[in-house]
Amino acid sequence: MAYPFQLGLQDATSPIMEELMNFHDHTLMIVFLISTLVLYIISLMLTTKLTHTSTMDAQEVETVWTILPAVILIMIALPSLRILYMMDEINNPVLTVKTMGHQWYWSYEYTDYEDLCFDSYMIPTNDLKPGELRLLEVDNRVVLPMELPIRMLISSEDVLHSWAVPSLGLKTDAIPGRLNQATVTSNRPGLFYGQCSEICGSNHSFMPIVLEMVPLKHFENWSTSMI
């Protein structure tokens, strides 16, 4: 869950988000080292009067500043490609949930059940109970089993939307006429909040997403009560 003046990412709840946080730290370290080197060179240029007016050809220097950036880019690209592959890979999901974006709410359908579907609207500020979060609470939460792979099929019925839950490392576009998919796996139970992350009209800010991850037994009891 995000909080005011937060500097870092939200706590990771899924294996994908853990990998994304590691990749973020890996890339940030490389950027920091490059920035330090550039600032050091600039400071030397500003503080020294020494110049190399006779240097017309420096084959070694050109070789270094050609090979070194290529190596750095490879160091960034390889872990990035690995994470992209992990995000697209779905192995034997135990559950499939179809998510449809509308102006301005979400609808969910549990395709493994016969009549388990509902719409999810934001709770207006005046109707919030003590402790509930403004612009983030919904009337119907998406209840899912934890520690199991779940496939989300995401689309839209009108305009472009984006289904995003930062704690799980999820952000998938909802495009009319196209079906995108994402894998949801939570390492722990709890409530995880997200919002539509694609500007979709005047009420774009009022399309929250709430996932309630519970043990499998609790999910079975919930699904039975909903049918």
Curated annotation (Swiss-Prot):
Mg(2+) binds at E198. Residues 1-14, 88-227 are mitochondrial intermembrane. Residues 46-59 are mitochondrial matrix. The keyword Membrane applies. Binds a dinuclear copper A center per subunit. GO terms for molecular function: copper ion binding; cytochrome-c oxidase activity. It catalyses: 4 Fe(II)-[cytochrome c] + O2 + 8 H(+)(in) = 4 Fe(III)-[cytochrome c] + 2 H2O + 4 H(+)(out). Its cofactor is Cu cation. Cu cation A1 binds at H161, C196, C200, M207. The keyword Transferase does not apply. Cu cation A2 binds at C196, E198, C200, H204. The chain crosses the membrane at residues 15-45, 60-87. GO terms for biological process: ATP synthesis coupled electron transport. Keywords: Copper, Electron transport, Magnesium, Membrane, Metal-binding, Mitochondrion, Mitochondrion inner membrane, Respiratory chain, Translocase, Transmembrane, Transmembrane helix, Transport. SUPFAM superfamilies: Cupredoxins, Cytochrome c oxidase subunit II-like, transmembrane region. Its EC number is 7.1.1.9. It is found in: Mitochondrion inner membrane. Disulfide bonds: none annotated. Belongs to the cytochrome c oxidase subunit 2 family. This is Cytochrome c oxidase subunit 2. It comes from Apodemus semotus.
